[in-house]
Amino acid sequence: MHKDWPAMADELNVAIKEVRLGTPDVMKAFSAMAQAATKGGALDAKTKELIAIAIAVAIRCDGCVAFHAKAAVKLGATRDEVMEAMGMALYMGAGPSLMYAAQAVEAFDQFAAMQPGA
């Protein structure tokens, strides 16, 4: 099964905009939480995105996979780092996570191929 992860992220951005317009206070709070959770601290932002993509696999959230694969690429994650994160997701989620791990790697590869010089 092949999915177009960049297109999925773009389509979800349109849908999320509608939610943002309909629930501005909730979405402001969600954005503030996202900023607080992803900023560097004891763990850097890239490590946090690797954790996020592993969690996205474990909870089987396609949109989450798309957004966190894109963010991981932007933060300089390597394919090897994503693979190690997928190993942890598999360990924590067993068989169903294997299906999402394959999709998360596919999403990462698609976003990485879009980078200049790829």
Q: Language-model segments: what does each one mean?
A:
Residues 1-47, 99-118:
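Acidic, glycine/proline-rich low-complexity segments that act as flexible tails and inter-domain linkers
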Residues 42-59, 80-86:
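Immediate flanking context of iron-sulfur cluster ligation sites
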Residues 67-79:
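Iron-sulfur (Fe-S) cluster-binding segments and ferredoxin-like electron-carrier domains
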Residues 83-109:
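C-terminal structural segments of small proteins and small subunits
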